[in-house]
Amino acid sequence: LEAAADFAKALGSSFVIITVIEPYSYTNLSEYRPESIDQYDSRVKEMAQERLEIARELVEKKDINCEVVAFKSFSPAEAIIDAANEYNCDLIFMASHGRQGFAAVLLGSETQKVLTHSKIPVMVYR
């Protein structure tokens, strides 16, 4: 995040930080979950807001205009692209998280999905 903020500052750009919240899963197992849909929604929204506020503080310390937003989606890559389009972003700045081995196969790469499907340029920071 700090590298993205430095990049935006150098260009005199504003900043939109998003986090993606996974919706409550309505699987057969959801009836065995220890929390209700409302409890889940409240908990994940609170966690998202905490993360976003930490990020906002870091960016605003660099005197950069910043907006933070949480999107709800089962597909983080799709939500990132939708957010970038909705906020008329000129660039999507993403970290390249090096998941390795079996986890990479199971989880896939959200960064790769954004790179593949976004019509907005994507900068990957490693």
What positions do the PLM features span?
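Small/aliphatic-rich secondary-structure junction motif
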Residues: 1-35, 58-67
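Short, well-ordered secondary-structure micro-motifs
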Residues: 27-30, 78-81, 104-106
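Short, hinge-like loop/turn segments at secondary-structure boundaries
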Residues: 33-36, 84-87, 110-111
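A short acidic, glycine-rich active-site loop
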Residues: 36-50
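Structural beta-alpha unit
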Residues: 57-92
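Glycine-rich, Arg-bearing micro-motifs that act as flexible, cationic patches
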Residues: 91-116
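Short, flexible loop segments at boundaries between secondary-structure elements
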Residues: 120-126
